[in-house]
Protein backbone atom coordinates (compact mmCIF):
# COMPACT_ATOMS: atom_id res chain seq x y z
CA UNK A 1 0.00 0.00 0.00
CA UNK A 2 2.85 2.25 0.55
CA UNK A 3 3.82 1.89 -3.00
CA UNK A 4 0.40 3.06 -4.00
CA UNK A 5 0.78 6.03 -1.70
CA UNK A 6 4.14 6.76 -3.31
CA UNK A 7 2.39 6.82 -6.65
CA UNK A 8 -0.10 9.35 -5.29
CA UNK A 9 -3.05 7.05 -4.97
CA UNK A 10 -5.13 7.45 -1.83
CA UNK A 11 -6.61 4.04 -1.06
CA UNK A 12 -9.74 5.13 0.84
CA UNK A 13 -10.47 7.62 -1.89
CA UNK A 14 -9.83 4.96 -4.53
CA UNK A 15 -12.22 2.50 -2.83
CA UNK A 16 -14.83 5.24 -2.56
CA UNK A 17 -14.45 5.95 -6.25
CA UNK A 18 -14.83 2.23 -7.11
CA UNK A 19 -17.95 2.01 -4.92
CA UNK A 20 -19.31 5.19 -6.47
CA UNK A 21 -18.58 3.85 -9.95
CA UNK A 22 -20.34 0.54 -9.10
CA UNK A 23 -23.34 2.43 -7.72
CA UNK A 24 -23.39 4.61 -10.83
CA UNK A 25 -23.28 1.52 -13.05
CA UNK A 26 -26.08 -0.10 -11.03
CA UNK A 27 -28.22 3.02 -11.20
CA UNK A 28 -27.53 3.45 -14.91
CA UNK A 29 -28.39 -0.18 -15.46
CA UNK A 30 -31.67 0.17 -13.58
CA UNK A 31 -32.77 3.58 -14.83
CA UNK A 32 -31.14 3.95 -18.23
CA UNK A 33 -30.06 0.63 -19.72
CA UNK A 34 -33.29 -1.35 -18.97
CA UNK A 35 -35.65 1.37 -20.29
CA UNK A 36 -33.48 1.85 -23.39
CA UNK A 37 -33.47 -1.91 -24.00
CA UNK A 38 -37.23 -2.02 -23.43
CA UNK A 39 -37.73 0.85 -25.91
CA UNK A 40 -35.44 -0.88 -28.44
CA UNK A 41 -37.32 -4.17 -27.99
CA UNK A 42 -40.64 -2.34 -28.36
CA UNK A 43 -39.41 -0.58 -31.49
CA UNK A 44 -38.11 -3.88 -32.90
CA UNK A 45 -41.51 -5.47 -32.22
CA UNK A 46 -43.32 -2.56 -33.91
CA UNK A 47 -41.04 -2.84 -36.94
CA UNK A 48 -41.66 -6.61 -37.16
CA UNK A 49 -45.43 -6.08 -36.87
CA UNK A 50 -45.27 -3.35 -39.49
CA UNK A 51 -43.33 -5.65 -41.83
CA UNK A 52 -45.87 -8.44 -41.23
CA UNK A 53 -48.74 -6.03 -41.95
CA UNK A 54 -46.92 -4.87 -45.09
CA UNK A 55 -46.55 -8.47 -46.22
CA UNK A 56 -50.24 -9.09 -45.50
CA UNK A 57 -51.21 -5.98 -47.46
CA UNK A 58 -49.00 -7.13 -50.35
CA UNK A 59 -50.64 -10.56 -50.29
CA UNK A 60 -54.11 -9.00 -50.19
CA UNK A 61 -53.20 -6.68 -53.06
CA UNK A 62 -51.87 -9.61 -55.06
CA UNK A 63 -55.04 -11.63 -54.35
CA UNK A 64 -57.18 -8.63 -55.30
CA UNK A 65 -55.22 -8.23 -58.54
CA UNK A 66 -55.63 -11.94 -59.34
CA UNK A 67 -59.35 -11.69 -58.55
CA UNK A 68 -59.60 -8.60 -60.75
CA UNK A 69 -57.84 -10.37 -63.63
CA UNK A 70 -60.11 -13.38 -63.16
CA UNK A 71 -63.23 -11.20 -63.23
CA UNK A 72 -61.96 -9.35 -66.31
CA UNK A 73 -61.37 -12.71 -68.00
CA UNK A 74 -64.88 -13.86 -67.10
CA UNK A 75 -66.37 -10.58 -68.31
CA UNK A 76 -64.42 -10.90 -71.55
CA UNK A 77 -65.73 -14.44 -72.04
CA UNK A 78 -69.29 -13.32 -71.30
CA UNK A 79 -68.88 -10.41 -73.69
CA UNK A 80 -67.63 -12.79 -76.38
CA UNK A 81 -70.63 -15.07 -75.77
CA UNK A 82 -72.99 -12.09 -76.05
CA UNK A 83 -71.31 -11.05 -79.30
CA UNK A 84 -71.55 -14.59 -80.68
CA UNK A 85 -75.24 -14.77 -79.72
CA UNK A 86 -75.89 -11.39 -81.33
CA UNK A 87 -74.13 -12.46 -84.53
CA UNK A 88 -76.06 -15.74 -84.56
CA UNK A 89 -79.35 -13.92 -83.98
CA UNK A 90 -78.47 -11.42 -86.71
CA UNK A 91 -77.71 -14.26 -89.13
CA UNK A 92 -80.99 -15.96 -88.25
CA UNK A 93 -82.93 -12.73 -88.78
CA UNK A 94 -81.14 -12.10 -92.07
CA UNK A 95 -81.81 -15.67 -93.24
CA UNK A 96 -85.47 -15.37 -92.24
CA UNK A 97 -85.77 -12.07 -94.11
CA UNK A 98 -84.18 -13.65 -97.20
CA UNK A 99 -86.58 -16.60 -97.01
CA UNK A 100 -89.56 -14.27 -96.60
CA UNK A 101 -88.39 -12.17 -99.54
CA UNK A 102 -87.98 -15.31 -101.67
CA UNK A 103 -91.45 -16.52 -100.69
CA UNK A 104 -92.94 -13.12 -101.47
CA UNK A 105 -91.13 -12.99 -104.82
CA UNK A 106 -92.36 -16.48 -105.69
CA UNK A 107 -95.91 -15.49 -104.74
CA UNK A 108 -95.65 -12.37 -106.90
CA UNK A 109 -94.31 -14.43 -109.82
CA UNK A 110 -97.10 -16.94 -109.37
CA UNK A 111 -99.72 -14.17 -109.36
CA UNK A 112 -98.12 -12.55 -112.40
CA UNK A 113 -98.07 -15.88 -114.27
CA UNK A 114 -101.71 -16.47 -113.37
CA UNK A 115 -102.68 -12.98 -114.56
CA UNK A 116 -100.70 -13.43 -117.80
CA UNK A 117 -102.38 -16.82 -118.40
CA UNK A 118 -105.80 -15.30 -117.78
CA UNK A 119 -105.12 -12.36 -120.09
CA UNK A 120 -103.71 -14.71 -122.76
CA UNK A 121 -106.77 -16.96 -122.46
CA UNK A 122 -109.03 -13.92 -122.75
CA UNK A 123 -107.15 -12.69 -125.83
CA UNK A 124 -107.24 -16.18 -127.39
CA UNK A 125 -110.98 -16.42 -126.67
CA UNK A 126 -111.53 -12.99 -128.15
CA UNK A 127 -109.48 -13.90 -131.24
CA UNK A 128 -111.46 -17.13 -131.64
CA UNK A 129 -114.70 -15.20 -131.44
CA UNK A 130 -113.46 -12.67 -133.97
CA UNK A 131 -112.14 -15.43 -136.22
CA UNK A 132 -115.46 -17.27 -135.94
CA UNK A 133 -117.31 -14.07 -136.80
CA UNK A 134 -114.98 -13.44 -139.73
CA UNK A 135 -115.39 -17.01 -140.91
CA UNK A 136 -119.16 -16.70 -140.73
CA UNK A 137 -119.00 -13.42 -142.63
CA UNK A 138 -116.72 -14.92 -145.25
CA UNK A 139 -118.89 -18.01 -145.59
CA UNK A 140 -121.94 -15.82 -145.98
CA UNK A 141 -120.29 -13.80 -148.71
CA UNK A 142 -119.05 -16.96 -150.42
CA UNK A 143 -122.55 -18.26 -150.54
CA UNK A 144 -123.81 -14.95 -151.88
CA UNK A 145 -121.26 -14.82 -154.65
CA UNK A 146 -119.79 -17.28 -157.00
CA UNK A 147 -116.09 -17.21 -156.54
CA UNK A 148 -113.46 -16.96 -159.14
CA UNK A 149 -109.84 -16.17 -158.33
CA UNK A 150 -110.26 -12.41 -158.45
CA UNK A 151 -113.45 -12.46 -156.46
CA UNK A 152 -111.90 -14.79 -153.93
CA UNK A 153 -108.92 -12.47 -153.48
CA UNK A 154 -111.18 -9.43 -153.19
CA UNK A 155 -113.27 -11.23 -150.58
CA UNK A 156 -110.20 -12.09 -148.48
CA UNK A 157 -108.96 -8.50 -148.69
CA UNK A 158 -112.30 -7.07 -147.61
CA UNK A 159 -112.57 -9.52 -144.68
CA UNK A 160 -109.08 -8.61 -143.54
CA UNK A 161 -109.88 -4.90 -143.77
CA UNK A 162 -113.06 -5.43 -141.77
CA UNK A 163 -111.14 -7.40 -139.15
CA UNK A 164 -108.54 -4.64 -138.76
CA UNK A 165 -111.36 -2.12 -138.46
CA UNK A 166 -112.94 -4.26 -135.72
CA UNK A 167 -109.64 -4.49 -133.87
CA UNK A 168 -109.18 -0.75 -133.96
CA UNK A 169 -112.62 -0.28 -132.43
Curated annotation (Swiss-Prot):
Keywords: ATP synthesis, Cell membrane, CF(0), Hydrogen ion transport, Ion transport, Membrane, Transmembrane, Transmembrane helix, Transport
GO molecular function annotation: proton-transporting ATP synthase activity, rotational mechanism; proton-transporting ATPase activity, rotational mechanism
Keyword Ion transport on entry: yes
Pfam family, one: ATP-synt_B
Subunit and interaction comment: F-type ATPases have 2 components, F(1) - the catalytic core - and F(0) - the membrane proton channel. F(1) has five subunits: alpha(3), beta(3), gamma(1), delta(1), epsilon(1). F(0) has three main subunits: a(1), b(2) and c(10-14). The alpha and beta chains form an alternating ring which encloses part of the gamma chain. F(1) is attached to F(0) by a central stalk formed by the gamma and epsilon chains, while a peripheral stalk is formed by the delta and b chains.
Protein name: ATP synthase subunit b
Subcellular location: Cell membrane
Record function comment: F(1)F(0) ATP synthase produces ATP from ADP in the presence of a proton or sodium gradient. F-type ATPases consist of two structural domains, F(1) containing the extramembraneous catalytic core and F(0) containing the membrane proton channel, linked together by a central stalk and a peripheral stalk. During catalysis, ATP synthesis in the catalytic domain of F(1) is coupled via a rotary mechanism of the central stalk subunits to proton translocation. Component of the F(0) channel, it forms part of the peripheral stalk, linking F(1) to F(0).
Family according to the record: Belongs to the ATPase B chain family.
GO CC terms in record: plasma membrane; proton-transporting ATP synthase complex
Cross-referenced InterPro entries: ATP_synth_B-like_membr_sf, ATP_synth_b/b'su_bac/chlpt, ATP_synth_F0_bsu_bac, ATP_synthase_B_chain
Topology of this chain in the membrane: Single-pass membrane protein
Transmembrane segments: 11-31
Classification via Gene3D superfamilies: F1F0 ATP synthase subunit B, membrane domain (1.20.5.620)
Amino acid sequence: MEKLAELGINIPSFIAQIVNFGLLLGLLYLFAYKPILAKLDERSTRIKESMERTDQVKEQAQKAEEEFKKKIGEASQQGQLVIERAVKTGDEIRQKAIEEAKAEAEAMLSRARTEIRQERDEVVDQLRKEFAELTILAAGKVIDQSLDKKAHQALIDSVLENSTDLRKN
